[in-house]
């Protein structure tokens, strides 16, 4: 079976971890293809156990699945080992986790530069997580990065880190007045860490393509969301990689024709963390309600997420940019007990109406949402397991979102648990 891509269709935090966990039992492989530990996935098992993952694919919680950290990911060795230890301490088998030899390593100087740069920028800062993700991707593009495979050759590794530190220490000391990092200490720490994960390093491209040739199912799991994509997002308030569907092939080493389904994960309302324009953002009691009822606290940052009504403009944009075939709508249960539920169907910018994403961030920042008021429902829907179990007004809301987004809503989340899901059609169905 060809590959299936899971895409965040908004600004991240849509519930991708739950979806990967739900579908993982039907896949042989789960691959993380971009980002680093700047994003978090929360998975609630049927037992009620709650797991938070930042770097390791969500499929690690499903027995029998091989999990891959792909070449498009930037790997913080300390975070990797800490996350592995945390899983193993709770009885999770991590033996089937593999790491691409071509993934880049996130180094101490990346974190140091990221943090000091954000402080230096003041009120002009992007709002990064401060975990060094951007600087690591900068080094990758500048061809001065350290790759996972480099730890297999300590001599060559030392030369590469030495060359990098000659420049990084100049930046830290002469520009930011910070202390220089010690070469020997950086190398020694990394080699000690590498002893604990070097057995996982392999040519994951070869393995994934062989698996697809054998008819196995591969889930490609993105981090963040479409509007945080460095090319297609609300630049410059974006991440440093490509969470969109195009990045899935690039960050895993499979060809784009291998992709069978693009499943967009869409929250029933909209949230965002950090700086940047957000047309439907709420600053009233409705925003407070969504944040409290939806437990909208960032898994990685601990920051409260900004909350707003559903924005069909960005949903249509995500459908177009990713070629989304199906949607998984999450957190519909959060909207219960609202008298009306507004949906943004377009923007008004300088007196002109549009139903498409503006091409400049200044236009998006001053966009006034055009709302369509939909009737709310009061019933508790957390126990619904069939579409017909939902109140009529909740069904109407889903169908209207489906129409506006431009792709069918195949599944609906009505709670955080794996079993709190309504399946309208099989997203892994054959399309031939």
Swiss-Prot record:
Keyword Flavoprotein carried by entry: no
InterPro entries reported for this sequence: Adenylosuccin_syn_GTP-bd (IPR018220), Adenylosuccin_syn_Lys_AS (IPR033128), Adenylosuccinate_synth_dom1 (IPR042109), Adenylosuccinate_synth_dom2 (IPR042110), Adenylosuccinate_synth_dom3 (IPR042111), Adenylosuccinate_synthetase (IPR001114), P-loop_NTPase (IPR027417)
Keywords of this entry: Cytoplasm, GTP-binding, Ligase, Magnesium, Metal-binding, Nucleotide-binding, Purine biosynthesis
Active site as annotated: 13, 41
SUPFAM superfamilies associated with the record: P-loop containing nucleoside triphosphate hydrolases
Enzymatic reactions: IMP + L-aspartate + GTP = N(6)-(1,2-dicarboxyethyl)-AMP + GDP + phosphate + 2 H(+)
Amino-acid positions noted as binding Mg(2+) in the UniProt annotation, renumbered to this chain: 13, 40
Keyword Repeat attributed: no
Binding-site list for substrate: 299-305
Similarity-based family: Belongs to the adenylosuccinate synthetase family.
Protein purpose: Plays an important role in the de novo pathway of purine nucleotide biosynthesis. Catalyzes the first committed step in the biosynthesis of AMP from IMP.
Record-given protein name: Adenylosuccinate synthetase
Organism for this UniProt entry: Mycobacterium leprae (strain TN)
Recorded name of the encoding gene: purA
């Amino acid at each position: 079976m060809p590959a299936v891509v899971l895409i965040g269709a908004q600004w991240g935090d849509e519930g991708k971890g739950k979806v990967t966990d739900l579908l993982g039992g039907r896949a042989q492989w789960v691959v993380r293809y971009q980002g680093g530990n700047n994003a978090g996935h929360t998975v609630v098992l049927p037992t009620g156990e709650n797991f938070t993952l930042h770097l390791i694919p969500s499929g690690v919680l499903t027995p029998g699945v091989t999990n891959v950290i792909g070449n498009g990911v930037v790997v913080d060795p300390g975070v990797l080992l800490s996350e592995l230890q945390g899983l193993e301490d709770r009885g999770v088998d991590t033996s089937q986790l593999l790491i691409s030899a071509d993934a880049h390593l996130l180094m101490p100087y990346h974190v140091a530069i990221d943090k000091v740069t954000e402080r230096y920028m003041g009120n002009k800062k992007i709002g990064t997580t401060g975990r060094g993700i951007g600087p690591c991707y900068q080094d990758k593009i500048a061809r001065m990065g350290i790759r996972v495979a480099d730890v297999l050759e300590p001599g060559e590794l030392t030369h590469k880190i030495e060359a990098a530190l000659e420049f990084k220490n100049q930046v830290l000391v002469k520009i930011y007045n910070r202390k220089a990092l010690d070469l020997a200490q950086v190398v020694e720490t990394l080699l000690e860490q590498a002893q604990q994960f070097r057995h996982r390093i392999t040519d994951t491209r070869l393995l994934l393509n062989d698996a697809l040739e054998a008819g196995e199912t591969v889930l490609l799991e993105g981090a963040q969301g479409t509007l945080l994509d460095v090319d297609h997002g609300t630049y410059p308030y974006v991440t440093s990689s490509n969470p969109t569907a195009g990045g899935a092939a690039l960050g895993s080493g499979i060809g784009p024709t291998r992709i069978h389904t693009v499943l967009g994960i869409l929250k029933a309302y909209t949230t965002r963390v950090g700086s940047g324009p957000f047309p439907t953002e709420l600053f009233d009691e409705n925003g407070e309600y969504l944040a409290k009822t939806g437990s909208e606290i960032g898994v990685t940052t601990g920051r409260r997420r900004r909350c707003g009504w559903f924005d069909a403009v960005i949903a249509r944009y995500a459908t177009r940019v990713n070629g989304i075939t199906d949607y998984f709508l999450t957190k519909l249960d959060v909207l219960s007990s609202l008298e009306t539920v507004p949906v943004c169907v377009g923007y008004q910018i300088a007196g002109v109406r549009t139903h498409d994403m503006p091409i400049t961030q200044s236009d998006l920042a001053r966009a006034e949402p055009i709302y369509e008021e939909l009737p709310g429902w009061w019933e508790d829907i957390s126990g619904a397991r069939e579409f017909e179990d939902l109140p009529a007004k909740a069904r109407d809301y889903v169908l209207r979102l489906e129409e506006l987004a431009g792709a069918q809503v195949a599944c609906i989340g009505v709670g955080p648990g794996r079993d709190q899901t309504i399946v309208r059609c099989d997203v892994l169905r054959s399309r031939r």
